[in-house]
Swiss-Prot record:
This protein's name: Protein PA-X
GO process annotations (BP): viral RNA genome replication; viral translational frameshifting
Entry annotation: catalytic residues: 80, 108
InterPro entries named among the record's database cross-references: PA/PA-X, PA/PA-X_sf
Residues with site note (Important for efficient shutoff activity): 202-203, 206
Gene Ontology MF annotations: RNA binding
Organism expressing this protein natively: Influenza A virus (strain A/Chicken/Pennsylvania/1/1983 H5N2)
Alphabetized UniProt keyword annotations: Decay of host mRNAs by virus, Eukaryotic host gene expression shutoff by virus, Host cytoplasm, Host gene expression shutoff by virus, Host mRNA suppression by virus, Host nucleus, Host-virus interaction
Subcellular location: Host cytoplasm; Host nucleus
Assigned protein family: Belongs to the influenza viruses PA-X family.
Site label Important for efficient shutoff activity and nuclear localization, positions: 195, 198-199
UniProt domain comment: The probable endonuclease active site in the N-terminus and the basic amino acid cluster in the C-terminus are important for the shutoff activity. The C-terminus acts as a nuclear localization signal. The C-terminus is recruited to host protein complexes involved in nuclear Pol II RNA processing.
Described purpose of this protein according to its UniProt entry: Plays a major role in the shutoff of the host protein expression by cleaving mRNAs probably via an endonuclease activity. This host shutoff allows the virus to escape from the host antiviral response. Hijacks host RNA splicing machinery to selectively target host RNAs containing introns for destruction. This may explain the preferential degradation of RNAs that have undergone co- or post-transcriptional processing.
Disulfide bonds: none
């Protein structure tokens, strides 16, 4: 699973996921299913945000990569992926500027068009149950919830899906492709079932025991299927800015 994640996702997303796990004392090399889930969630958050801007009249518009619209304001502020202190700083700044109610839990995005925080969910389980769990945890009508599944289903607060159909279809297609690629490598069942994942982990650890001290040969080749899987949606200029913003070390 770890090799699949590193091949499948944008390097910046992998780096952010590793950083988030280490912040909570988790090891991406051991908890590989969680590693994959965090990368998937991060990618959906970025895809949700990318190409969506607000023009000078306050209207939401879609701008594809390469268009000369650098002065447009991004519609969504990305909160997910930042370290907790920085994330709360961003949330507090938004609340102070807009007057919106401060959430009890860190949301994933802020929508400047609708003036609301957004909680993004990506589930391997039954979507209605997952939505109810999210809503029960957040306990706030001010935070908008939008859930996607790997089967192409989605569910949102008051059936308000925020994005246009094409943008949502891009997210659903990406999730379905990830599922198919996992399945073709025999990874999907353990990704869906925690019990199966634990069994697979024990099996992997047992296989590693006899050669723990041996050097590991790593292949850096990417299969043709993974080349098509590599996300092409990220705006290169924004990627660089996000990397600088999200990954910079805090000053001591």
């Amino acid at each position: 699973m770890e090799d699949f994640v590193r091949q499948c996702f944008n390097p910046m997303i992998v780096e952010l996921a590793e950083k988030a796990m280490k912040e909570y004392g988790e090891d991406p090399k051991i908890e590989t299913n969680k590693f994959a889930a965090i990368c998937t969630h991060l990618e959906v958050c970025f895809m949700y945000s990318d190409f969506h801007f607000i023009d000078e009249r306050g209207d939401s518009i879609i701008v594809e990569v390469g268009d000369p619209n650098a002065l447009l304001k991004h519609r969504f502020e990305i909160i997910e992926g930042r370290d907790r202190n920085m994330a709360w700083t961003v949330v507090n700044s938004i609340c102070n500027t807009t007057g919106v109610e401060k959430p009890k839990f860190l949301p994933d995005l802020y929508d400047y068009k609708e003036n609301r925080f957004v909680e993004i969910g990506v589930t391997r389980r039954e979507i209605h149950i997952y939505y109810l769990e999210k809503a029960n945890k957040i306990k706030s009508e001010k935070t908008h919830i939008h859930i996607f599944s790997f089967t192409g289903e989605e569910m949102a607060t008051k059936a308000d899906y925020t994005l246009d159909e094409e943008s949502r279809a891009r997210i659903k297609t990406r999730l379905f492709t990830i599922r198919q690629e996992m399945a073709s490598r025999g990874l999907w069942d353990s990704f869906v079932s925690p019990r199966e994942a634990k069994r697979q982990l024990k099996k992997d650890l047992k296989l590693q025991e006899p050669c723990a001290g041996s050097p590991t040969k790593v292949s850096h080749r990417t299969s043709p299927a993974l080349k098509t899987l590599e996300p092409m949606w990220m705006d290169s200029n924004r990627t660089a800015a996000l990397r600088a913003s999200f990954l910079k070390c805090p000053k001591k």
